[in-house]
Design a protein with these regions (language model features):
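An acidic/histidine-cluster motif and surrounding catalytic segment
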Residues: 1-125, 135-165
Length: 165
């Protein structure tokens, strides 16, 4: 399992590769970091933040989906927020607000990228943006919530230069 921590003045993104089935393209980790930062900027998030992003395979995300959501299937991304209503635990070592964990199945992302006709990088960044919005409290259970979330996703993807082609 490979870990890579990346930080700037306000955002620490810890990326862990917990799978061996999909080769991580050059530059993907930097794009994921940019996606996390773009969401926080777009949402005008105040203070230092910390988020963990883990890449897994379909088998592992299936296990997590079953354990935590009682859904017996693989999915593309899971979000595990550590805060609620804008209140987050603070890392005592860094003072950063701990937003939570993003878990992405690179296998599923690769399948979806092929299905939608775009790159794995774009798909993983979209899933990162989607999950980051969940960590900040957004949801898509109701049609109006879904519309708001989709608009925010498109706005952030545009900011990082990964619009739909």
């Amino acid at each position: 399992m490979m870990m890579m921590a990346m930080a700037n003045d306000k955002v620490r993104v810890i990326i862990t590769d917990g799978q061996k089935k999909v080769r991580i393209p050059t530059g993907l980790r930097m794009l994921v970091r940019r996606a996390c930062i773009a969401v926080l900027r777009e949402e005008k998030f105040e203070g230092n933040a910390e988020v963990c992003v883990t890449f897994v395979d379909n088998e592992e995300i299936h296990r997590l989906n079953k354990e935590f959501r009682e859904k017996d299937s693989a999915t593309d991304v899971l979000s595990f927020p550590l805060g609620e209503n804008g209140i987050y635990d603070v890392n005592p070592d860094t003072g950063a607000k701990q937003l939570g964990d993003v878990v992405i199945s690179l296998e599923r992302a690769e399948e979806q990228a092929a299905e939608f006709g775009h790159s794995l990088q774009r798909e993983v960044c979209y899933l990162t943006v989607h999950s980051m919005l969940h960590l900040l409290g957004y949801d898509h259970m109701e049609p109006d919530e879904k519309a708001v979330m989709r608009k925010k996703e498109e706005s952030v993807m545009s900011l990082i230069g990964l619009t739909r082609s």
